[in-house]
């Protein structure tokens, strides 16, 4: 056996594997979870319908932590006209590791006229974690998206800095007839100068958006005392937030969502019940 084959087999054998596939379908004016398949410790609770047609789903990872060699895959498919809101009851925690990289891969496919709200808790990378995060959203014509991603490097609430380890994060949003967003962030332990020394980074994306939506968002951001900015890339609104306080950052994201949901989706805010616990 070649060395490369032994290394590949070693990384494949290490850690847990989990895969969750969800398909949302619209019928009779209501979105249903039409199909679900899961392998390993990644699953969902029963759907909630606090506002009628949209389907609210909580994604669960019972172990609570991700360690060396773990491979988690999330595959979400929305059929035409469907509307799903997905969130999580807790943060995704990437623990310290001296072994293979822990990997989280997320794929979201939005067919024509569908709507996705992806509002997860933060991903926390403990000092010494070796992690890869790869998220890709593919939107067909008429699809609508509200999605955020929060990266917490170290545990600032406990005074722990991300002094060791490595993070490789990719985020792609593919729009019809538009370049969309394709970015990559790589941080090795202690290199928080890329973030101006801030341990918390959030990206909030909304599509489709226009200059009037951008103006509403910038008005809210002007009230903040932490670094923030927003820009339009064609019809894609991209918001960046830096912070030292996770609770403050989560509160800011929720405030933005309360502004963007009616502006982009034409719906009043209906917060997931888990946010109140």
UniProtKB/Swiss-Prot annotation:
Q: Does the keyword Cytoplasm apply?
A: yes
Listed under GO cellular component are: cytoplasm
Entry keyword set: Chaperone, Cytoplasm, Nickel insertion
An example molecular function term from Gene Ontology annotations: nickel cation binding
The record's listing under Pfam families reads:
UreD (PF01774)
InterPro entries reported in the protein's UniProt record: UreD
* Record flagged with keyword Transcription regulation: no
Q: Which domain of life is it from?
A: Bacteria
- Annotated compartments: Cytoplasm
Similarity field: Belongs to the UreD family.
| UniProt subunit comment | UreD, UreF and UreG form a complex that acts as a GTP-hydrolysis-dependent molecular chaperone, activating the urease apoprotein by helping to assemble the nickel containing metallocenter of UreC. The UreE protein probably delivers the nickel.
Q: Tell me, what does this protein do in biology?
A: Required for maturation of urease via the functional incorporation of the urease nickel metallocenter.
Protein's name in the database: Urease accessory protein UreD
């Amino acid at each position: 056996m070649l060395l490369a084959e032994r290394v590949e087999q070693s990384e494949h054998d290490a850690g847990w594997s989990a895969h969750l596939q969800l398909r949302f379908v619209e019928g009779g004016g209501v979105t249903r979870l039409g199909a679900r398949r899961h392998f390993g410790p990644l699953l969902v609770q029963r759907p909630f319908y606090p506002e009628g047609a949209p389907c609210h789903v909580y994604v669960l990872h019972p172990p609570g932590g991700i360690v060396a060699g773990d491979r988690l895959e999330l595959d979400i498919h929305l059929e035409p006209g469907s509307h799903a809101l997905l969130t999580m009851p807790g943060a995704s925690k990437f623990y310290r590791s001296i072994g293979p990289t822990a990997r989280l891969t997320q794929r979201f496919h939005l067919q024509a006229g569908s709507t996705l709200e992806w509002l997860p808790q933060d991903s926390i990378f403990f000092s010494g974690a070796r992690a890869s995060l790869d998220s890709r959203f593919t939107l067909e014509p008429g699809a609508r998206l509200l999605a955020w991603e929060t990266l917490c490097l170290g545990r600032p609430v406990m005074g722990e800095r991300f002094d060791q380890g490595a993070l490789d994060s990719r985020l792609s949003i593919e729009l019809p007839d538009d370049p969309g967003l394709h970015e990559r962030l790589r941080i090795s332990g202690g290199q928080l100068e890329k973030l101006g020394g801030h341990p918390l980074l959030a990206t909030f994306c909304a599509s489709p958006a226009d200059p009037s939506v951008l103006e509403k968002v910038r008005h809210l951001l002007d009230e903040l005392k932490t670094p923030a900015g927003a820009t339009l890339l064609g019809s894609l609104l991209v918001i960046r937030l830096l912070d030292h306080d996770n609770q403050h950052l989560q509160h800011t994201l929720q405030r933005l969502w309360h502004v963007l949901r009616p502006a982009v989706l034409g719906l009043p805010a209906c917060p997931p019940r888990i946010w109140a616990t």
